[in-house]
Amino acid sequence: MSEEYKGMAIGVFELESECACFVALDAAAKAADVKIQGVERNRLSAGACVKMRGTVSNVNAAMEAALRTAEPLSKIVSHTIIAAPSEEAETAIRMTINK
């Protein structure tokens, strides 16, 4: 696991619109102390997936802000928060970020 993110929760949301993802991640970053770890464009659609890191409470606040901002702009495909990611989850997240 990257020492930079050790002990941090992971928040992930996916929207049908890549443009809406950037608006939503901006809202998330302004709402709470989170680090945007990556944006992954969907290969088969115009959407994208955003990964962010921080304390559980900050990721929760950021996720709420992101989804509230995204809702009028795009369909929310999925979202989740992993409070204490396993080494396997950390490895999988790194693989999607560093490709």
Region locations from a protein language model:
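Solvent-exposed alpha-helices and their adjacent loops that cap or buttress functional pockets
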Residues: 2-6, 29, 40-44, 74
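Short, low-order "capping/linker" segments at domain edges
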Residues: 87-99
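Short amphipathic alpha-helix segments
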Residues: 19-33
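A short linear hydrophobic-aromatic micro-motif
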Residues: 34-40, 78-79
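Conserved short beta-strand edge segments in small beta-sheet-based binding/regulatory domains
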Residues: 72-84
